[in-house]
Amino acid sequence: MFTAVAPPQETLPRDLVGAIQSLKKELNAVILAHYYQEAAIQDIADYLGDSLGLSQQAASTDADVIVFAGVHFMAETAKILNPHKLVLLPDLEAGCSLADSCPPREFAEFKQRHPDHLVISYINCTAEIKALSDIICTSSNAVKIVQQLPPDQKIIFAPDRNLGRYVMEQTGREMVLWQGSCIVHETFSERRLLELKTQYPQAEIIAHPECEKAILRHADFIGSTTALLNYSGKSQGKEFIVGTEPGIIHQMEKLSPSKQFIPLPNNSNCDCNECPYMRLNTLEKLYWAMQRRSPEITLPEATMAAALKPIQRMLAMS
């Protein structure tokens, strides 16, 4: 559940970054931002990372206020880990197509049809789905977590079918997959990937495991956003075709300014494939959220208590 406020009518300060820094001190706040946020937000964040890193930071912060520049399931996770702290999300409409693809009631029925199965849910899901899960995972640790389970343990993996299939291939484990997907990674075009490879024959193809198999089979490296960033920095390659949300390219260019990064387009005429939900957050909205102490993330106590256990299990197994 989210607490909304009317759009602000006041004038923005001229020095927006300076005003945000002042509010951060006043509130004893920390700004956590995902790699898919706009560059201006990435540059002002106290911690920038992928879902695993952001969860670890949320679990360990001593700040009184958490300003989460990401999407709602990320802010929910921060609230679950910090039930007594103020957690702010700049735009309440910053949802997630993957999380939306797994409705709690339908998933509960799906779970009942597969008794004796342990439920591993990708962190890109709602608090209600987390509460129905045994272990949460991220793209950084999904393979590692599955490898720690007994070989005869039956597994449900939700909600991303592409990540689930990738984990099955990496571990050799059979899993029952919920058929959800991410609109960004689902719509990358193999045809346009091959066209780019012809245009940039020396380019390495790096891709997120949420991509379809048609994309991953061409990849030189597959990994989480953090893994892709690290690989691009260490590789001797000079050109990279990037198969994930292009927000990460800002950090890739900062890490390796002499290298070229080409965003993989989708099937439309767009030359990139931005997440429309991630891009709802702006520096201006972040300022208003801090200035007004709202919109605040709130969740039922019972849901938070149930969802906390699988998150803690993930952190312990990572």
Curated annotation (Swiss-Prot):
One MF annotation (Gene Ontology) recorded for this entry: 4 iron, 4 sulfur cluster binding
Q: Report whether Cytoplasm shows up as a keyword of the record.
A: yes
Residues binding [4Fe-4S] cluster, per UniProt: C96, C182, C275
What reactions does this protein catalyze?
iminosuccinate + dihydroxyacetone phosphate = quinolinate + phosphate + 2 H2O + H(+)
Q: Which UniProt keywords apply?
A: 4Fe-4S, Cytoplasm, Iron, Iron-sulfur, Metal-binding, Pyridine nucleotide biosynthesis, Transferase
Return the similarity comment.
Belongs to the quinolinate synthase family. Type 2 subfamily.
Q: What is the protein name stated in its UniProt record?
A: Quinolinate synthase
Source species taxonomy = Bacteria, Bacillati, Cyanobacteriota, Cyanophyceae, Synechococcales
